[in-house]
């Protein structure tokens, strides 16, 4: 189950983000590959340019487009997904 820590995104888009993260975790084990999968899915579905960070320990400070940001956990893995640029 996903635990959302911070969000500025429609409910539909939130569900898509969590779904993409679950799919990525099933397909890949390397965090860079997980992030790349999610980024590409969102670039396709919601037009570029999305950025995705996946990991167990990172800090962040980002600028994002309004209504295009989510930060959540699946287990012990954090996902930061946002659109900028």
UniProtKB/Swiss-Prot annotation:
Key word Acyltransferase present: no
CDD domains on file: DLC-like_DYNLL1_DYNLL2
Subcellular location as annotated: Cytoplasm, Cytoskeleton; Nucleus, Nuclear pore complex
GO molecular function annotations of the record: ATP hydrolysis activity; dynein intermediate chain binding
Main location (coarse class): cytoplasm
Disulfide bridge partners, by residue number: none
Gene Ontology CC terms: cytoplasmic dynein complex; cytosol; meiotic spindle pole body; microtubule; nuclear periphery; nuclear pore; nucleus
A UniProt-annotated Pfam family: Dynein_light
PROSITE patterns recorded: DYNEIN_LIGHT_1
Keywords tagged on the record: Cytoplasm, Cytoskeleton, Dynein, Microtubule, Motor protein, mRNA transport, Nuclear pore complex, Nucleus, Protein transport, Translocation, Transport
GO biological process terms on file: ascospore formation; dynein-driven meiotic oscillatory nuclear movement; mRNA transport; protein transport
Biological role: Acts as one of several non-catalytic accessory components of the cytoplasmic dynein complex that are thought to be involved in linking dynein to cargos and to adapter proteins that regulate dynein function. Cytoplasmic dynein 1 acts as a motor for the intracellular retrograde motility of vesicles and organelles along microtubules. May play a role in changing or maintaining the spatial distribution of cytoskeletal structures. Also a component of the nuclear pore complex.
Family assignment from sequence similarity: Belongs to the dynein light chain family.
Subunit structure: Homodimer. Cytoplasmic dynein consists of two catalytic heavy chains (HCs) and a number of non-catalytic subunits which present intermediate chains (ICs), light intermediate chains (LICs) and light chains (LCs). Component of the nuclear pore complex (NPC). NPC constitutes the exclusive means of nucleocytoplasmic transport. NPCs allow the passive diffusion of ions and small molecules and the active, nuclear transport receptor-mediated bidirectional transport of macromolecules such as proteins, RNAs, ribonucleoparticles (RNPs), and ribosomal subunits across the nuclear envelope.
Protein name: Dynein light chain 1, cytoplasmic
């Amino acid at each position: 189950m996903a635990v959302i820590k911070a969000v500025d995104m429609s409910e539909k888009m939130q569900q898509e983000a969590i779904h993409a993260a679950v799919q990525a975790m099933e397909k890949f084990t390397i965090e860079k590959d997980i992030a790349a999968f999610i980024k590409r899915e969102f670039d396709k579905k919601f037009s570029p340019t999305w950025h995705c960070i996946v990991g167990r320990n990172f800090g962040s400070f980002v600028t994002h487009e309004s209504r295009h940001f989510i930060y959540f956990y699946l287990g012990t893995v954090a996902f930061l997904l946002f659109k900028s640029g």
